[in-house]
Regions:
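N-terminal helix-rich module
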Residues: 2-6, 30-165
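Alpha-helical hydrophobic helix detector
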Residues: 18-33
């Protein structure tokens, strides 16, 4: 048997391996960035839904006991929303229940300066809005005069809420 020394090259070269590693790392970084953006959007939507549920409970309370509940909001990072007497800051330890942002990067960006609240008769409300924001975008909570509470996203679309008109 005659052995020939002209065997074909098998395997991958160092440059090919480096190109594959570079492509994998680029795809991983891109996926991680997308995942972080998705997590931020999810946190924003969850906080907006929590605020919506808090306001629905206040609306139910106003309707059940036929009384008025006037809302207030304190803007800024880790802002808060509540009713009755407005404290000086969100960190004051008064006994009144209020909604405080659970995430450190959440912000109460904008809210209606006029009186906003619920009135027990016929489940009516004084219309207004509260806007929550983080790095993923912003969601506006809208309170209509008929007592409907809805969410919409400002700017870019967010999962789980339609865009504001």
């Amino acid at each position: 048997m005659k052995k020939s020394n002209d065997s074909k090259q098998q395997g991958m070269s160092l440059i090919e391996i480096l190109v594959v590693i570079m492509l994998i790392s680029i795809c991983s970084l891109w996926g991680m960035h997308g995942w972080q953006g998705y997590q931020q959007a999810l946190r924003l939507e969850q906080n907006a839904q929590r605020l919506r549920l808090y306001l629905i409970s206040l609306q139910t309370q106003a309707n059940a006991y036929n009384r008025s509940i006037i809302l207030w909001a304190i803007g800024g990072i880790q802002g808060c929303v509540g009713y009755s007497l407005r404290p000086a800051s969100c960190t004051s330890s008064e006994g009144l229940p209020r909604f405080v942002m659970s995430e450190s990067d959440m912000e109460v960006l904008d809210f209606t300066e006029k009186v906003m609240g619920f009135y027990g008769i016929r489940n009516a409300a004084q219309a207004g809005h509260i806007t929550l924001m983080n790095s993923a975008g912003s969601i506006r909570l809208v309170l209509s005069a008929r007592g409907r509470i809805r969410l919409c996203s400002e700017g870019k679309p967010m999962p789980g809420s339609p865009q504001c008109l």
